[in-house]
Amino acid sequence: MSKRTFQPNNRRRAKTHGFRLRMRTRAGRAIISTRRAKGRTRLAA
């Protein structure tokens, strides 16, 4: 029996999909701006 693939971890979540990480790259900033334009309440993890 294999284990579940999703093992929740808030620190890992923030480090891989967080706002600071998104702002680091040009593509990441594009993601944030798209989500802002769409009117998302949560921009990043």
Swiss-Prot record:
Q: Does the keyword Transmembrane helix apply?
A: no
UniProt keyword Ribonucleoprotein, yes or no = yes
Q: Name one GO cellular component term.
A: ribosome
A single GO molecular-function term is: structural constituent of ribosome
Please provide an example of a Pfam family that matches this protein in its UniProt record: Ribosomal_L34
Q: Which domain of life is it from?
A: Bacteria
Q: Which UniProt keywords apply?
A: Ribonucleoprotein, Ribosomal protein
Listed GO biological process terms: translation
Protein name listed in UniProt: Large ribosomal subunit protein bL34
